[in-house]
């Protein structure tokens, strides 16, 4: 840590605190995520390990936040990321009204390019939401927080937990307890994010899992085996029943959105996961090629995080770890292959 000067605190996540820092020799500004180990014998938290591995698999995309270095520190380790000025949640929060159509197109296009790159490399993010889409000082959107990401098994035989994704962006199959799923969970989240950008507020703001399903059903209608044959195989399908609800036309939900925008949105928000439009296909949709065209990143709003140079922390878990410990990190805790030295650019 001696090579960095801490400039302020950005926020707190599930496994550590994120700081804004400057490299002493190069002057480069970075974001340092300090990950503490509660007990040395527990080893590296799975989420932190997944984030490292996923980012090393897809480090060549300009639409994914770059992991610059990983190094041990005290009873834990530190991830050094490129510094990003804000996030899409702040953009939506600061907007006085829904974003302009050209701005929505630009953000969505950058998001889809990042998602397409991840999926092409068999990475499923599993927690796409505006707060995990960071914005650089130049307006570039990049996907961050790969703590829930997994390498996708194309044969579909692998079981995963359904307790992933932030509730408002959680796909219906996850709400019904699916243990086998694929990139479709990310595509549903993209649709939720697109709807939020068009609407200026979340499409499905449920306060618990049951209410979340109700929010979805109110707009998309009650799912049936006729529309979604696989629903009967989901673990929680028979645990709760809903009265028949007809879908509400998306043009009534988002009356100011264009026909092309609603057509693309509808292809994300489909009950059968395999029928959702792929990110690579979505980038070819007519929506992106009709006026107004996507805005240049320099034309996009870039709000500062609250607090200016010392941004307000995002809500985190009640426990706060002490990172200022002098105990050496046992070699067995950290795979040496995951440790990369800081290499200054240029």
Curated annotation (Swiss-Prot):
One of its GO terms (cellular component) is cytoplasm. Disulfide bonds: none annotated. ATP binds at residues 10-18, 33. It catalyses: L-seryl-[protein] + ATP = O-phospho-L-seryl-[protein] + ADP + H(+); L-threonyl-[protein] + ATP = O-phospho-L-threonyl-[protein] + ADP + H(+). Residues 4-288 form the Protein kinase domain. It comes from the Eukaryota. Its EC number is 2.7.11.22. It is an enzyme of class 2 (transferase). One of its GO terms (molecular function) is ATP binding. Gene3D superfamilies: Phosphorylase Kinase, domain 1 (3.30.200.20), Transferase(Phosphotransferase) domain 1 (1.10.510.10). The active site is at 127 (proton acceptor). Residues 303-318 have a biased composition (Pro residues). Required for high-level Shh responses in the developing neural tube. Together with TBC1D32, controls the structure of the primary cilium by coordinating assembly of the ciliary membrane and axoneme, allowing GLI2 to be properly activated in response to SHH signaling. Involved in cell growth. Activates CDK2, a kinase involved in the control of the cell cycle, by phosphorylating residue 'Thr-160'. Belongs to the protein kinase superfamily. CMGC Ser/Thr protein kinase family. CDC2/CDKX subfamily. Monomer. Interacts with TBC1D32 and MAK. This is Cyclin-dependent kinase 20. The lineage of its organism: Eukaryota, Metazoa, Chordata, Craniata, Vertebrata.
